[in-house]
UniProtKB/Swiss-Prot annotation:
Keywords: Ribonucleoprotein, Ribosomal protein. Belongs to the bacterial ribosomal protein bL34 family. Disulfide bonds: none annotated. The lineage of its organism: Bacteria, Pseudomonadati, Pseudomonadota, Betaproteobacteria, Neisseriales. This is Large ribosomal subunit protein bL34. One of its GO terms (biological process) is translation.
Amino acid sequence: MKRTFQPSVVKRKRTHGFRARMKTRGGRAVIAARRSKGRARLSA
């Protein structure tokens, strides 16, 4: 049986990357929340 997680750096960055987050209002909210929490990594 094929596993569900088939890693790909390109797909990861395109879906969860910083620029992808900045494109939508909700994504910007995510970045803001992570900034206020003091996360070391804001996005993938």
